[in-house]
């Protein structure tokens, strides 16, 4: 199985009718969200910026729609590789991403659920629900292989996700997951040590401020790799 997919709309447009591409894109993004896999949407996102300093309104809407569909990342190609305005293209895409993220709602219904939730997903969904109800700005996750962090991300929390891991490869992979900030630590010896270090990292990274409510999810501390604990703390 792959770790994720890239929705390359240019290639899709060659293989399937052009009017089907948007539906294929939405279907693939939803399946990746459901399976907790990374999904990147790419090709011709701001294509007119190869020659022009501003995108068309349709292109801006295309980027925003991919984000609202649930993509983890959007990618430029010719715009930054050979275009006249690479810096402007990256800047405008980042602005569209930031603005759209503000309006994406948490996905706490059953659309992305399996018929029977795994323990990890059930706990992580509960953590997102708790964070929303408490207006917590941050969810801190202990994760070894990244599964717990991706399970939290699956439900589109408003809160940022701080993924604490001892695995540098996991941290690198989580850089592609939407809303996740990975931090590598030397060790996580116990649940109490995770709570203490996680809160310190929240303050050090600037993702949390003194007095903030945070939800902490312990995934890496269970031998089976299953997340089974979510708790509420104050920084």
From Swiss-Prot:
- Top EC class, one word: transferase
Q: How does it assemble?
A: Homotetramer.
* Disulfide linkage: none
Catalysed reaction, written as an equation: pyruvate + ATP = phosphoenolpyruvate + ADP + H(+)
PANTHER family, alphabetically? PYRUVATE KINASE (PTHR11817)
| Alphabetized UniProt keyword annotations | ATP-binding, Glycolysis, Kinase, Magnesium, Metal-binding, Nucleotide-binding, Potassium, Pyruvate, Transferase
Name of the protein described by the UniProt record: Pyruvate kinase I
Query: Pfam families from the xrefs?
Result: PK, PK_C
| Residues that coordinate or bind substrate | 10-11, 43
Q: Which GO terms describe its molecular function?
A: ATP binding; kinase activity; magnesium ion binding; potassium ion binding; pyruvate kinase activity
Q: Which gene encodes it?
A: pki
What SUPFAM superfamilies does the entry give? Phosphoenolpyruvate/pyruvate domain, PK C-terminal domain-like
Q: Which residues cross the membrane?
A: none
Q: Which cofactor does it need?
A: Mg(2+); K(+)
Q: What is its EC number?
A: 2.7.1.40
Task: Tell me the pathway.
Answer: Carbohydrate degradation; glycolysis; pyruvate from D-glyceraldehyde 3-phosphate: step 5/5
